[in-house]
Amino acid sequence: MSAAAVERPNEDRPLIAEANRIMDRLPGYRVEIIGGQIIVSPPPDGPHAEALTDLMLPFAASGLHGTESKVLQGVGLWLPTGTEDYAIPDLVVVDADYRDHYVENNCYDPICFRLVLEVTSSNYRTDLRDKVKAYAAAKIPVYVIIDRKHQRLHVLTSPTGDDYESHRPHSPGEVVTLPKSIGAEVTLDVAEILKAGQPQNG
């Protein structure tokens, strides 16, 4: 049983109010609250966006963006790790009725998330450490990380406490099939994804 979502005024949410002020001052930046800390990420570069588009295609082709589930970018995920914690993953697979699970501040209850995916940027440590704990605590079944710095694709499954029981890094040359629990069979070519996301120099 879940209570109806109640929109709280920002005066009662000082961190959220500050995060929203930062977003107003820095259009295009991603602002999240993880572990009670405000995390500010610069706008993604072109290769980051290219990798994300290349990732969208196999998810959509598998039928995941349909009547049972949706494949979305930039959707807020309400986190249980703090009273104002939320994240904005790069890509998510959610139940089709995700709108019924709205919490507040453009964020949704983690119960409707089947998968979250992050393509790393300059603050890659957040994706590889802080968000592992946060997404595990939220019981997100599958967390995929495209680690552009170290040229790896990580698949984390079976959340327990603030960690995942299974954490498998994959290298270029491998082809990875994601767990069918997300609702369909999705296969990713590690080399192709990492090549598309290769950071620009300079």
Role assignments for model-derived ranges:
Residues 1-138, 142-202:
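Gly/Pro/Ser/Thr-rich low-complexity, intrinsically disordered segments predominantly at protein N-termini
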